[in-house]
Protein backbone atom coordinates (compact mmCIF):
# COMPACT_ATOMS: atom_id res chain seq x y z
CA UNK A 1 0.00 0.00 0.00
CA UNK A 2 2.89 2.37 0.72
CA UNK A 3 4.09 2.07 -2.86
CA UNK A 4 0.62 2.93 -4.20
CA UNK A 5 0.33 5.86 -1.78
CA UNK A 6 3.77 7.16 -2.80
CA UNK A 7 2.89 6.99 -6.49
CA UNK A 8 -0.52 8.61 -5.96
CA UNK A 9 1.10 11.33 -3.82
CA UNK A 10 3.65 12.13 -6.53
CA UNK A 11 0.89 12.49 -9.14
CA UNK A 12 -1.13 14.78 -6.85
CA UNK A 13 1.88 16.95 -5.97
CA UNK A 14 2.86 17.25 -9.65
CA UNK A 15 -0.69 17.95 -10.88
CA UNK A 16 -1.97 20.24 -8.11
CA UNK A 17 1.28 21.83 -6.95
CA UNK A 18 0.51 21.11 -3.30
CA UNK A 19 3.01 20.30 -0.57
CA UNK A 20 3.62 16.58 -0.13
CA UNK A 21 2.90 16.95 3.61
CA UNK A 22 -0.67 18.01 2.77
CA UNK A 23 -1.38 14.80 0.85
CA UNK A 24 -2.90 12.57 3.53
CA UNK A 25 -5.24 9.60 3.15
CA UNK A 26 -8.19 11.62 4.45
CA UNK A 27 -7.45 14.72 2.32
CA UNK A 28 -10.25 15.66 -0.06
CA UNK A 29 -9.09 16.60 -3.55
CA UNK A 30 -11.47 19.55 -3.73
CA UNK A 31 -11.83 20.82 -0.15
CA UNK A 32 -8.33 20.13 1.21
CA UNK A 33 -6.11 20.17 -1.87
CA UNK A 34 -7.86 22.89 -3.90
CA UNK A 35 -8.65 20.80 -6.97
CA UNK A 36 -11.50 21.75 -9.27
CA UNK A 37 -13.59 19.30 -11.29
CA UNK A 38 -11.19 19.38 -14.24
CA UNK A 39 -8.23 18.71 -11.94
CA UNK A 40 -10.00 15.64 -10.57
CA UNK A 41 -10.72 14.32 -14.08
CA UNK A 42 -7.06 14.84 -15.02
CA UNK A 43 -5.91 13.15 -11.81
CA UNK A 44 -8.06 10.11 -12.61
CA UNK A 45 -6.59 9.98 -16.12
CA UNK A 46 -3.06 10.14 -14.73
CA UNK A 47 -3.87 7.40 -12.21
CA UNK A 48 -5.17 5.24 -15.07
CA UNK A 49 -1.89 5.76 -16.94
CA UNK A 50 0.34 5.26 -13.90
CA UNK A 51 -1.36 2.05 -12.79
CA UNK A 52 -2.27 0.77 -16.27
CA UNK A 53 -5.97 0.49 -15.46
CA UNK A 54 -9.31 1.82 -16.58
CA UNK A 55 -11.45 3.67 -14.03
CA UNK A 56 -15.10 3.87 -15.03
CA UNK A 57 -16.88 7.22 -14.81
CA UNK A 58 -19.12 5.72 -12.12
CA UNK A 59 -16.11 4.68 -10.02
CA UNK A 60 -14.28 7.96 -10.68
CA UNK A 61 -17.21 9.89 -9.18
CA UNK A 62 -16.70 7.97 -5.92
CA UNK A 63 -13.02 8.94 -5.65
CA UNK A 64 -13.10 12.09 -3.53
CA UNK A 65 -10.10 11.66 -1.24
CA UNK A 66 -6.53 10.45 -1.47
CA UNK A 67 -7.57 7.38 0.52
CA UNK A 68 -10.41 6.66 -1.91
CA UNK A 69 -7.91 6.64 -4.78
CA UNK A 70 -5.40 4.43 -2.97
CA UNK A 71 -8.06 1.96 -1.80
CA UNK A 72 -9.63 1.79 -5.27
CA UNK A 73 -6.28 1.10 -6.92
CA UNK A 74 -5.42 -1.57 -4.34
CA UNK A 75 -8.79 -3.26 -4.87
CA UNK A 76 -8.22 -3.44 -8.64
CA UNK A 77 -4.72 -4.93 -8.57
From Swiss-Prot:
The modification O-(pantetheine 4'-phosphoryl)serine is found at residue 37. One of its GO terms (biological process) is lipid A biosynthetic process. Keywords: Cytoplasm, Fatty acid biosynthesis, Fatty acid metabolism, Lipid biosynthesis, Lipid metabolism, Phosphopantetheine, Phosphoprotein. 4'-phosphopantetheine is transferred from CoA to a specific serine of apo-ACP by AcpS. This modification is essential for activity because fatty acids are bound in thioester linkage to the sulfhydryl of the prosthetic group. Residues 2-77 form the Carrier domain. Pathway: Lipid metabolism; fatty acid biosynthesis. Its main location: cytoplasm. Coiled coil: none annotated. It comes from the Bacteria. Signal peptide: none annotated. It is found in: Cytoplasm. GO terms for molecular function: acyl binding; acyl carrier activity. GO terms for cellular component: cytosol; membrane. Belongs to the acyl carrier protein (ACP) family. Carrier of the growing fatty acid chain in fatty acid biosynthesis. This is Acyl carrier protein. It comes from Bacillus pumilus (strain SAFR-032).
